[in-house]
Amino acid sequence: MVVNNPNNWHWVDKNCIGWAKEYFKQKLVGVEAGSVKDKKYAKIKSVSSIEGDCEVNQRKGKVISLFDLKITVLIEGHVDSKDGSALPFEGSINVPEVAFDSEASSYQFDISIFKETSELSEAKPLIRSELLPKLRQIFQQFGKDLLATHGNDIQVPESQVKSNYTRGNQKSSFTEIKDSASKPKKNALPSSTSTSAPVSSTNKVPQNGSGNSTSIYLEPTFNVPSSELYETFLDKQRILAWTRSAQFFNSGPKLETKEKFELFGGNVISELVSCEKDKKLVFHWKLKDWSAPFNSTIEMTFHESQEFHETKLQVKWTGIPVGEEDRVRANFEEYYVRSIKLTFGFGAVL
């Protein structure tokens, strides 16, 4: 990144969200609670979603970081059953805010066990006592490593700075950064000056398919068997009931793979890509005002807990134009989740 900022006087910023995603994939995946040979064991399987903003900034020689992220990781593990056999489980941990000013004690964690039973619930105390403290440490270190990696990219070198004031700020900033950053590791992320571009804030939907897309993760719960919820997204009469307005182009009673349809007066254009009965649905989905190249993908996985009489709907949503995440999330929660619960009585509405 080329910097044209005499004496480092003016505000300069750098978008580091791509680097942040790679950082957390490298740091979080594989973090464990207990040992695989223990009666209870859990580990982070993958990073499902990272949403938000991440930048490094400087003005008058002072380097700071600004980030506010929502992180969801997928977990797996096992607990011993009453007969001594291992019961495997999968789930998720949602962290609604990892911010530049967060304290180690302020992080909130929402732990979810898919297809939960009273026996599988015994994994939660282990996750809280052994896994979450490790996550707190990683989140606290992130801001320091972010500055150590990218702080130099947004400043003119100290040797070219004539102002004693900004040079003093610059020197003190990097003394603090060096003292707080983690020691370099063999597989540490590279410090690239070309892959992160300066921030350009806009509320407009990107007008090209250049890859300016992001993802979100949702996990609503419905008080209904997975088979009923699954049919609610496929049966055309049910779709008409919870959307109040839908247009189908095939005459069959249910959606079929590769079938396109429109919802909410044509404001949503969708297509059923694939289905696995009572387990998974995949849709292409776009808003009418998105430009042609954009077509997001919704992957819905149904996790039924017969003991707790509920189904968790795991929603992985990719290919959303940058800047549209909040709009898409709000629309799904209001016009899908809330509407389905109210129409069919599939759960409480807050």
Curated annotation (Swiss-Prot):
Q: Where is the composition biased (Low complexity)?
A: 190-202
Tell me what induces its expression: By heat shock.
The record gives the effect of mutating residue 53 to K as: Decreases activation of Hsp90 ATPase activity and substantially reduces Hsp90 binding affinity
**What SMART domains does the record point to?**
Aha1_N (SM01000)
Recorded hits in CDD domains, A to Z, give: SRPBCC_Aha1
Q: Which GO terms describe its biological process?
A: protein folding; protein import into nucleus
Q: Where is the composition biased (Polar residues)?
A: 158-175, 203-212
Q: Name one Pfam family in it.
A: Aha1_N
Disulfide pairs?
Answer: none
**Spans annotated as Disordered:** 158-212
Keywords assigned by UniProt, alphabetized: Chaperone, Cytoplasm, Stress response
* Bilayer-crossing regions: none
Subunit structure of this entry? Monomer. Interacts with HSP82.
| This protein's name | Hsp90 co-chaperone AHA1
Which organism does this sequence originate in? Saccharomyces cerevisiae (strain ATCC 204508 / S288c) (Baker's yeast)
